[in-house]
Amino acid sequence: MSEKINANQDNDRQITLVDDQGNEELFEILFTFTSEDYGKSYVLLYPAAVSDDDDVEVQAFSYDADEDGDVTSSDLHEISDDDEWNMVQGVLNTFLSDDRLSGE
């Protein structure tokens, strides 16, 4: 398995998601990575309005980068394959357990 993780070094990387009811919520980009096994890029997001004491629910999507290589909400795709989801979860677990990547 080969993935390249791009940790979010810029605190201003945000994206707005709109739910089925039309409610907008601002998210911070935790990090992006590319999987050679799946031939896709992925983005992991968390709500911008979370305090340090709150449990954070991270959301993951595959995405198609825009012409600048950036992520926009119109480029996001839900992950529906269980094996693909397990791979993404494994990358997230690695990120969270590695102080050099997570910035802790």
From Swiss-Prot:
<dbReference type="Pfam" id="PF06949">
    <property type="entry name" value="DUF1292"/>
</dbReference>
<comment type="similarity">
    <text>Belongs to the UPF0473 family.</text>
</comment>
<protein>
    <recommendedName>
        <fullName>UPF0473 protein LGAS_0424</fullName>
    </recommendedName>
</protein>
<dbReference type="InterPro" id="IPR018247">
    <property type="entry name" value="EF_Hand_1_Ca_BS"/>
</dbReference>
<dbReference type="InterPro" id="IPR009711">
    <property type="entry name" value="UPF0473"/>
</dbReference>
